[in-house]
Amino acid sequence: MSYSRRAILSLALAGCVIGGVAMAGESASFTPAGFEAAQKAGKPILVEITAPWCPTCRAQAPILNELCSEPRFKNLQVFAVDFDSQKDALLAVRAQRQSTLIVFKGATEVGRSVGDTSKASVEALLAKTL
């Protein structure tokens, strides 16, 4: 069976559109410089420790996507840390496990949770950045 280039590209594009939920806040991979700049700017920050094989992380993703798209979290700077490949970032934020969520108000850590998949408590955690 052969597929046209157009059909393959259409499917790939549809997968990107359906699979990706845009967050209102800025999202970036964790870098020490980016994290420090956000802290110095006094931004509300979420550091999300994830792993592609982690079922709890997969359960947290739609909750975070929904909450981060709310207008009150529009200025939230989200830094994603890959548990397997960014060990230096884990040390920087003193995280020991995947599915860890850490929130900051500027340079001050204001909350942390590990393995939380309750929308209400994740929302309460993010609200601490406001």
Predicted feature locations:
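N-terminal export leaders
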Residues: 3-9
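N-terminal signal peptide c-region/cleavage motif recognized by signal peptidases
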Residues: 17-21
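A short beta-strand-turn-helix
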Residues: 27-43
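Short active-site neighborhood of thiol/selenol oxidoreductases, capturing the structured segment around
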Residues: 40-52
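Typically the conserved alpha-helix immediately C-terminal to a functionally engaged Cys/Sec
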Residues: 58-72
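Thiol-based oxidoreductase modules, predominantly thioredoxin-like and allied folds used
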Residues: 68, 73-87
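Structural micro-motif
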Residues: 93-102
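Non-catalytic, surface beta->alpha helical segment in thiol-disulfide oxidoreductase systems
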Residues: 103-130
